[in-house]
């Protein structure tokens, strides 16, 4: 029996209409299209990360700005500007949401500190995402879209620091790698042709700094970019600061 005949016999068209779908045969394949384009049952906006999802949780006031605001380094206007540029969001409980949006403006995932990811929730809610291969990019990568190739890029560990530093040093594009387990040599591939500086956290043993020296060597062997690892904290942080594993923003706030 031909597939067209099977389709008619099984009354799949009628079944489809009953659940809001138009069922058609196209080039030998079944094609199901929502009868109502606005039918939320078949909207992918709430299955995979989307700019609609990003927009629905947007916010512009965050507690992590308070040290910089209290020190007079930032104004509330700058806080709102940074929150808008980085598409920051908030959970219902008030925790900041840091979206990973690539250089094609595709939201890939979102990080909710300290160690929770939106992709985990989506997989729990939607069985269809069981085999979803989640990709990550640098936080702030979307800022390349409207930047010149000559604009320097700086990379820190956490998103809060990148957002605040972007207002302190606006001539630089600030990004974050979020955590070392997410680092791979291809993470920096979209930055080819640019001058990039990594600002590692310091620690008493210099292990983090040495790790990034090795990482930078691997990246340079694979991708064409002018990559440096900043040693400011290794040279100028106190023993106490190194024991606390401060980052470059902590150093600025404490200076």
Where do the model's predicted regions map?
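Cysteine protease catalytic domains with a Cys-His-Asp triad
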Residues: 65-71, 98, 107
């Amino acid at each position: 029996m031909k597939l067209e005949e099977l389709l008619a016999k099984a009354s799949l068209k009628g079944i489809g209409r009953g659940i809001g779908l138009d069922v058609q045969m196209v080039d030998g394949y079944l094609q199901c299209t929502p009868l109502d384009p606005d039918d939320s049952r078949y909207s992918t906006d709430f299955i995979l990360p989307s700019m609609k999802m990003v927009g629905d949780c947007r916010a512009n006031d965050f507690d992590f700005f308070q040290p910089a605001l209290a020190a007079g380094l930032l104004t509330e206007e700058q806080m709102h500007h940074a929150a808008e540029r980085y598409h920051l969001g908030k959970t219902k409980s008030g925790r900041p949401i840091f979206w990973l949006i690539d250089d094609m403006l595709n939201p890939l995932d979102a990080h909710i500190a300290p160690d929770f990811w939106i992709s985990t929730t989506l997989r729990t809610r939607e069985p269809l995402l069981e085999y979803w291969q989640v990709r990550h990019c640098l936080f702030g990568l979307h800022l390349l879209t409207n930047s010149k190739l000559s604009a320097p890029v700086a990379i820190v560990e956490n998103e809060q620091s990148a957002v605040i530093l972007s207002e302190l040093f606006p001539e630089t594009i600030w990004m974050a790698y979020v955590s070392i387990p997410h680092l791979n040599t291809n993470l920096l591939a979209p930055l080819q042709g640019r001058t990039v500086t990594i600002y590692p956290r310091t620690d008493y043993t210099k292990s983090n700094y040495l790790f990034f020296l090795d990482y930078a060597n691997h990246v340079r062997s694979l991708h064409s970019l002018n990559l440096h690892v900043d040693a400011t904290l290794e040279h100028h942080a106190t023993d106490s600061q190194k024991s606390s594993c401060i980052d470059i923003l902590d150093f600025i706030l404490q200076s």
